[in-house]
């Protein structure tokens, strides 16, 4: 298992600080593994097992804790009086009204809180307002090329670099005996999970906001995703994407395209690279 030293260092730097540590990143980039590694770091630093509460909301064993009141009760019963308790809530966005739990735990003494999520939308709206000035976001990416080589147990070479550029840095890909078919199936699984599950989760969070347009056309979403993937590295705008779709026979507005692109970036399928005016040293 490769040590994600950069992110472990960031968590360690914020240890025992009175801010909530929020780890975000695309599915399968290694967030859960990072939390496990950090918990081991805490144990090696003298933290007792009873001072660590760790819950992964994708684990069926914790299904009853998807109710925020049950979750709050469960954690309260396990807090260590007079000692720091380290709380890890993995994929917290699956819990309805999780903001209430996070806010309640934050105001308690001797609580060091860490949460993860696979959708940036969890940090907008109510949670952002609730936690304003009280959290730090650690944005996690898949493996860097250096980490990829380390995970693969090989020195850098043309073949390894070619694989990295073609398939990306998801940890599983670096460590498995891969064939092109296996990797394609694995990546397709991640993509479909993000498109369907994570964006559906984003929609559920927006249901109470009538001013927000909903992502309802998965075919359109995939079309936009494929187009964006085909023009990576080139200047792109909402208008250029809309023009492409219209020329392909899709009737769609720029507002709709903008909303769908937001959904893709919120789920970390794409990242924006802002354009700079070099002459004026100015962000456009």
Please report, for each region that a protein language model flagged, where it lies by residue.
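Pre-Walker A adenine-sensing motif
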Residues: 2-16
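Hydrophobic anchor at the beta1->P-loop junction of P-loop NTPases
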Residues: 23
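Conserved lysine of the Walker
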Residues: 31-32
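Short glycine-rich substrate-engagement loop in P-loop NTPases that contacts/grips substrate
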Residues: 53-85
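Conserved P-loop NTPase "ATPase switch" module shared by AAA+ and STAND
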Residues: 80-98
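Structural recognition of the conserved hydrophobic beta-strand(s) that form the central parallel beta-sheet
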Residues: 88, 112-118, 139
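Short regulatory helix/loop adjacent to the ATP-binding pocket of P-loop NTPases
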Residues: 104, 121-137, 151-153
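Accessory nucleic acid-recognition modules appended to NTPase machines
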Residues: 186-284
């Amino acid at each position: 298992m490769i040590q994600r030293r950069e992110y472990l260092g960031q968590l360690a730097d914020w240890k025992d600080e009175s801010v909530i540590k929020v780890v975000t990143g695309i599915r399968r980039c290694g967030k859960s593994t990072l939390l496990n590694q950090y918990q081991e770091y805490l144990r090696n630093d003298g933290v007792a097992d009873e001072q660590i509460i760790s819950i992964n909301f994708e684990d069926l064993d914790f299904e009853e804790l998807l109710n925020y009141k049950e979750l709050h009760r469960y954690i309260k019963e396990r807090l260590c009086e007079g000692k720091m308790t380290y709380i890890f809530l993995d994929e917290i966005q699956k819990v309805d009204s999780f903001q209430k739990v996070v806010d309640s735990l934050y105001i308690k003494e001797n609580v060091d809180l860490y949460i993860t999520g696979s959708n940036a939308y969890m940090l907008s709206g109510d949670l952002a307002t609730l936690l304003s000035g009280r959290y730090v976001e650690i944005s996690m990416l898949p493996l860097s090329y250096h980490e990829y080589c380390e995970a693969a147990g090989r020195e850098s070479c043309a073949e390894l670099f070619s694989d990295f550029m073609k398939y990306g840095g998801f940890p599983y890909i670096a460590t498995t005996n891969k064939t092109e078919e296996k990797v394609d199936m694995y990546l397709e699984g991640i993509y479909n999970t993000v498109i369907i599950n994570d964006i559906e989760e984003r929609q559920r969070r927006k249901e109470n906001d009538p001013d927000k347009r909903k992502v309802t056309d998965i075919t359109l979403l995939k079309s936009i995703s494929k187009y964006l993937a085909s023009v990576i590295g080139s200047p792109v705008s909402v208008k250029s994407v809309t023009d492409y779709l219209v020329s392909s026979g899709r009737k769609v507005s720029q507002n709709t395209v903008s909303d769908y692109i937001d959904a893709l970036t919120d789920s970390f399928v794409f990242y924006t690279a802002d354009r700079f005016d070099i002459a004026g040293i100015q962000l456009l």
